[in-house]
């Protein structure tokens, strides 16, 4: 996996002294080497302190180069924390990036590309990072063990919300959420390829190269801003050239292929069905502000025929006392800062590792001029290579020993070492490079439910059943030797291309020196001093695991939730295996027997804005305008959002003091003259086919085969559970042709439901369905003069008299000299009324013609408020009554239900609970005091009984002031309501503080005989 060659070349050469570069002092910057641009300096700030770095740095490497070790405080105990890793697995160095509305909390310093003017701040501290008063809480740490919130702060109970919870919330947490609306823009994009390669380390580069040479369409995703992965940290040779030069050559060849897309700064965060992957591209996160009209980030939906997972492996920390102190780092991270960034993490180091791979860090430290004080190897046998390494670096070799604890506060000063003979000693140091082995980065291989498999040879989990079309290679598969990684990647890329029809052979693998990553597991150091952390981000220690086991939380998923192991923003990348191993050790089970936790997307945190793309604010969903919108806007209409639609709520005129006056005026106009309302938002579904009548019989609870052509019928649709789903009218336009209308709110849901019924339940029926909601403009023309108005625009050859077009009839007509239209004699207002449908492109012209023709009749436009008042006056059920909890019987539709046939919801509608006579049913209510105003949601309580849940008999669902009756009226659901006509109740609205006496009455307040609508 790494190389120990001392041949470095100019690109990664090292000096033993640190000197300022580009005239800017950076006390821990090596004098030469690294993949940074020393010709330029980038100013940045950390906690208000101005510092400098170079292009090619991350924030973490720049902090290391400036000698900054303390970068944060821990989640629960507020312990000093430094930088642990050099990649996306970082659990400790979490900072706030930027400020104001662009502030981004909990950002990993190791993944932030340094840019000019970068602002970063530590978090979870007060008043300062160096002096955090909240750290005093460590005194109470015995009371803050795993699950403490279930066992402490329980008395007195009244203190929880007012005292305990606020204190806990103030003490815990990490960053602060941004203030204000996010000013940045985001995009969503789609990509398609033959082969997707995830990760650009040794295996990833070879996989992409093999696939690209075959002619396949290849996408190579790398979350870093450079390709190469751990090759960027290597000091050895690959095929005779320095590792970074090898990476540059392969990258240049990949970019030369027209069908290869190399995507740096792009994280694959999720694996989904059918070869679909989610990726986040950080388009402009590496600069202070995105350029105008460019996104900050872009969310990709990538569809790949084959995928090669070459995401590498994550180094595990060792579990010993105070292993979280600043200056205690992963060995691989130390190599990264030395070799890639030319930043020295310390001056005197102790290397503590249980595997051969960590020998490389000792060589690199020595080459960089860092004194290697000790090599602590817990393995009992002493290898000749270890002796040679100690001699080369001048380090003391402590074979069979362990580090029991780190000593220091804001930075490590020394370590306590227990040797094989039991003797303890102290070794002074300011850097501990630790390595507990490696865990293959297999998260993406398990997102679809695949379970990883334990591999004893590497002491880690490897991918088991990978998603269809995915293959893992290299370190992600548990292969750590560099030569084997190169070969495995080349083979996997060639096989992926071959599987999709491209003939190729694996690319030739360059020669490299053989390596060893042999590991002897050490899951924790026994007898350690101080807290030994397993999950650094959530402050979970080995003692927490022991406590969870004692309290019965031995299951992996229980352990995870009780201790919060692996539940932080890093998802336990460095913690999970160690936590499982400690539980296995305590319970005397193997790790496979203990189990493995479930990995879920996203792999790393993803900004919500990126997932939304342009769909934010008013663009969250498209706004739909009615055909008469421009005309209504010109009339000064006030609009209201109803679902996705923007509808006219009312039309204010001179003299109207408020919406209330405008609404009353519009209602009176309809009741006395004629009004026009745009009802195009109602769902309209065109149904055709020989089996259309049978289809309607099954989806509606009432009968449809008997409906004649040219007639309209009201219908009620039930859900499978027997409750009312939707209602509306359906017109029979021809023997096999129907037009169904739905409520505005349920238009999409009903269409989806009908499609399901057709395609899944009854695919044998000869019927076709299509939504025509946006193809037809529909206007309600209501009032005693509505026929006169229509006669002015309907062409004379069409007879629309009461005899020719009675109530609930429909007809094809032409208007305005030949314009095709549909006329329906239906009424929602209770007046003589029609609905006129015309092709949508003519909707604006028709509304203008109607208003022009109706001037002599006193025509008035009316909006949603007046429409609602008139439907309450007539007792029609709508949204408040169709709440998903009412049955057809509750709403008075029992006679509609054709129980002699089968229909959706029939069986469940006959359940005893739904036929209970005590159910709440639809009634009308009016106040005893005509001046009182009812409110929706008021609860019905019998007179002279306490107001409590036991005496709650129902509630009002819709209320309105009726200008026709000059009184407030309402609809409601009342227990045994039909038996209680004339009874007096209290309508109690505790929220608004009202208590009104009402009388129960029929739900139809106006013209119950229907004489007006049949006139």
Locate each region found by the language model.
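Residues forming the flavin
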Residues: 2-49, 53-623, 775
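Structural motif
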Residues: 46, 97, 642, 720, ...
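Residues forming anionic-ligand binding surfaces in small-molecule and nucleic-acid pockets
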Residues: 221, 313, 553, 664-680, ...
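Well-ordered mid-protein domain cores that form the structural environment of catalytic cofactors
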Residues: 705-736, 740-756
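Short amphipathic beta-strand starts and helix->beta connectors
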Residues: 457, 517-520, 665-672, 717-727, ...
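A short, contiguous, amphipathic alpha-helix enriched in charged residues
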Residues: 61-71, 690-707, 788, 792-797
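Acidic, proline/glycine-enriched N-terminal capping motif
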Residues: 578, 585-718, 723
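Conserved, structured C-terminal
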Residues: 629-634, 647, 734-736, 742-1015
């Amino acid at each position: 996996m790494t190389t120990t060659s001392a041949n470095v070349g100019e690109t990664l050469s090292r000096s033993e002294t640190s000197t300022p570069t580009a005239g800017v002092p950076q006390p821990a910057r090596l004098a030469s080497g690294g993949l940074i641009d020393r010709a330029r300096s980038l100013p940045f700030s950390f906690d208000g302190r101005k510092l400098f770095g170079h292009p090619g740095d991350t924030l973490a490497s720049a902090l290391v180069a400036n000698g900054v070790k303390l970068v944060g405080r821990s989640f629960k105990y507020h312990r000093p924390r430094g930088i642990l890793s050099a990649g996306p697995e970082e659990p400790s160095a979490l900072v706030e990036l930027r400020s104001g509305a662009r502030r981004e909390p909990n950002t990993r310093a190791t993944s932030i590309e340094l840019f000019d003017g970068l602002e970063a701040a530590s978090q979870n501290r007060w008043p300062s990072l160096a002096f955090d008063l909240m750290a005093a809480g460590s005194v109470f740490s015995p009371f803050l063990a795993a699950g403490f919130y279930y066992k402490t702060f329980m008395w007195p109970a009244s203190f929880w919300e007012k005292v305990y919870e606020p204190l806990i919330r103030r003490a815990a947490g990490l960053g602060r959420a941004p203030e204000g609306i996010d000013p940045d823009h985001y995009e969503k994009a789609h990509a398609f390829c033959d082969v997707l390669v995830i990760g650009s380390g040794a295996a990833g580069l070879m996989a992409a190269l093999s696939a690209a040479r075959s002619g396949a369409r290849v996408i190579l995703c790398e979350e870093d801003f450079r390709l190469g992965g751990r090759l960027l940290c290597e000091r050895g040779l690959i095929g005779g050239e320095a590792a970074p030069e090898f990476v540059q050559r392969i990258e240049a060849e990949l970019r030369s292929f027209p069908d290869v897309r190399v995507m740096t700064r792009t994280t694959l965060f999720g694996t989904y069905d059918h070869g679909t992957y989610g990726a986040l591209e950080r388009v402009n996160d590496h600069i202070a502000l995105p350029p105008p009209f460019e996104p900050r980030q872009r969310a990709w939906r990538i569809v790949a025929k084959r995928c090669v997972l070459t995401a590498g492996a994550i180094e595990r920390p060792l579990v010993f006392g105070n292993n979280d102190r600043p200056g205690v780092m992963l060995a691989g991270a130390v190599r990264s800062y030395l070799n890639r960034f030319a930043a020295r993490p310390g001056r005197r180091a102790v290397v503590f590792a249980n595997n051969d791979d960590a020998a490389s860090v000792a060589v690199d430290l020595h080459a960089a001029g860092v004194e290697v004080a000790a090599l602590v190897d817990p393995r009992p046998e002493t290898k000749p290579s270890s002796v040679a390494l100690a001699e080369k670096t001048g380090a003391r070799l402590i074979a069979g020993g362990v580090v029991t604890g780190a000593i220091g506060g804001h930075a490590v000063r020394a370590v306590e070492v227990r040797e094989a003979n039991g003797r303890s000693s102290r070794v002074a140091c300011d850097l501990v490079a630790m390595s507990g082995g490696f865990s293959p980065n297999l998260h993406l291989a398990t997102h679809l439910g695949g379970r990883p498999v334990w591999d004893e040879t590497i002491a880690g989990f490897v991918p088991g059943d990978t998603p269809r079309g995915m293959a893992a290679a290299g370190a992600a598969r548990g292969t750590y030797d560099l030569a084997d990684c190169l070969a495995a990647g080349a083979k996997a890329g060639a096989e992926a291309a071959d599987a999709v029809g491209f003939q190729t052979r694996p690319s030739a693998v360059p020669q490299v020196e053989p390596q060893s990553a042999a590991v002897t597991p050490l899951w924790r150091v026994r007898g350690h001093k101080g807290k030994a952390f397993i999950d650094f981000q959530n402050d979970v220690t080995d003692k927490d695991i022991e406590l969870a086991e004692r309290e019965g939380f031995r299951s992996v998923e229980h352990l995870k939730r009780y201790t919060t192991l692996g539940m932080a923003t890093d998802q336990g990348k460095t913690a999970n295996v160690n936590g499982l191993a400690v539980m296995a050790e305590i319970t005397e089970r193997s790790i496979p027997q203990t189990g493995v936790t479930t990995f879920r997307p996203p792999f790393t945190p993803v900004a919500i804005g990126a997932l939304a793309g342009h769909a934010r604010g008013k663009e969250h969903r498209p706004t739909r305008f009615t055909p008469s919108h421009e005309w209504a806007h010109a009339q000064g209409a006030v609009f209201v959002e109803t679902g996705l639609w923007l509808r006219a709520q009312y039309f204010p005129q001179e003299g109207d003091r408020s919406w209330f006056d405008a609404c009353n005026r519009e209602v009176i106009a309809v009741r006395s003259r004629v009004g026009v309302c745009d009802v195009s938002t109602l769902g309209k579904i065109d149904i055709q086919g020989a089996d259309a009548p049978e289809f309607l019989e099954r989806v509606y609870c009432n009968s449809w085969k008997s409906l004649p052509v040219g007639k309209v019928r009201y219908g009620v649709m039930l859900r499978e559970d027997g409750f009312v789903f939707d209602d509306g009218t359906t017109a029979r336009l021809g023997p096999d042709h129907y037009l169904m209308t739905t409520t505005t709110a349920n238009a999409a849901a009903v269409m989806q439901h009908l499609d399901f019924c057709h395609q899944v339940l009854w695919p044998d029926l000869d019927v076709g369905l299509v939504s025509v909601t946006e193809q037809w403009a529909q206007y309600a023309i209501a009032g005693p003069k509505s026929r006169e108005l229509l006669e002015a625009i309907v062409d004379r050859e069409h007879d629309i008299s009461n005899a020719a077009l009675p109530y609930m009839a429909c007809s094809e007509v032409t208007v305005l000299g030949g314009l095709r239209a549909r006329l329906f004699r239906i009424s929602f207002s209770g007046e003589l009324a029609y609905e006129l449908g015309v092709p949508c492109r003519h909707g604006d012209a028709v509304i203008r013609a109607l208003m022009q023709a109706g001037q002599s009749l006193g025509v008035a436009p009316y909006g949603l408020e007046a429409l609602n008042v008139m439907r309450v006056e007539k007792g029609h059920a709508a949204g408040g009554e169709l709440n998903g909890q009412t049955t057809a019987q509750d709403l008075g539709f029992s006679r509609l239900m054709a129980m002699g046939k089968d229909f959706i919801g029939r069986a469940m509608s006959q359940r005893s609970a739904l036929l209970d006579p005590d159910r709440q049913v639809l009634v009308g209510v009016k106040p005893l005091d005509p001046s009182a105003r009812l409110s929706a949601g008021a609860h019905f309580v019998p007179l002279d009984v306490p107001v409590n849940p036991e005496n709650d008999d129902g509630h009002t669902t819709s209320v309105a002031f009726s200008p026709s009756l000059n009184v407030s009226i309402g609809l409601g659901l009342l227990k045994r309501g039909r038996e209680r006509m004339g009874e007096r109740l209290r309508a109690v609205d505790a929220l608004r503080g009202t208590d009104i006496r009402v009388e129960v009455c029929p739900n139809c307040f106006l013209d119950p005989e229907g004489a007006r609508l049949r006139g």
